[in-house]
Amino acid sequence: MLSRYIHIFLFFSYIIPKTFVGLSMNIKLEREKLILFTKVGAIVLTSIALLSASLMIYPDTAATLSNSLVHEKELPIYCVEQDKPLISISFDAAWGNEDTPKLLEILKKHNVKATFFMTGGWIQKYPDDVKAIAAGGHDLGNHSENHKHMSPISAEECKTELMKPHEKVKELTGKDMILFRPPYGDDNDTLIKVCRETGYYPIQWDVDSLDWKDYDAATIIRRVTEHKHLGNGSIILCHNGGKHTAEALDELLTTLKQKGYQLVPISQLIMKDNYTINTEGRQVK
């Protein structure tokens, strides 16, 4: 920071003399130039010293000034500030449905409501599964029409990717989806703004099961239940088509309950209004 002050002083020491170029070079004017330059230099250095001292005394002011000069990225919801031990488990559905009935059966056994993020293609291919998910009281979530990376596309294309599956689910179930998870977790400011404009809450996750890597059931369970970010307000990511996800789910839910967690759908975990999202992606009041 000191180097910045030096540069400012050097700037004034260069500019001020230049303003006098072309003026009479008599002794009186030269003396006035010197006096003026000295006064301005003293004022500048005094101001810099006072500013530096105030920023050290009031660091919050310094942070505010810094933040006002830096563009703040729009953030989705990765987790939620929660006093109670509430968490959510979610399943991305983009390919296959072989294990979906088993997942729903296990969720019902544990009286757990989950959130399913579905692509437009999956909705169209497996309409009965969509209806079964809705009938089970689970959240119906939007996972885009074509499961493409969202950050490179325009706002209009983002809107199309959101609204096509929205209309399909509305036609099948009569329900309006309000949760959107971008494929690959790929988001940017444009997408987040489109979500808000279309009535969606952009949702990510803070606990990844990595079930899509075909880890065995024991590894999936351990990854989730021992995850460093697992805590009140966590959102767990799984996939309905994971090779061992269905095999792991029963014990996973049992272990999470033994740890004292209550599982609720994401729509019940998040705040709907009067919130902000901090730099960690945590939704807070």
Walk through the language-model features, giving the residues of each.
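N-terminal Lys/Arg-rich, disordered targeting/topogenic segments
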Residues: 2-37
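Hydrophobic membrane-insertion alpha-helices, especially the h-region
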Residues: 39-56
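C-terminal domain-boundary segment and adjacent tail
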Residues: 61, 69-83, 109-111, 122-124, ...
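Active-site beta->alpha N-cap acidic-glycine motif
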Residues: 63-153, 157-168, 173, 177, ...
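Active-site-proximal beta-strand/loop segments in catalytic clefts of secreted hydrolases
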Residues: 91, 118-119, 145, 181-185, ...
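Conserved, mostly hydrophobic/aromatic
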Residues: 92, 107, 143, 180, ...
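Alpha-helical scaffold elements lining the catalytic groove of polysaccharide deacetylases
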Residues: 97-99, 148-176, 186-232, 244-248
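Residue-level detector of anion-binding/catalytic polar loops
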Residues: 113, 139, 201, 208, ...
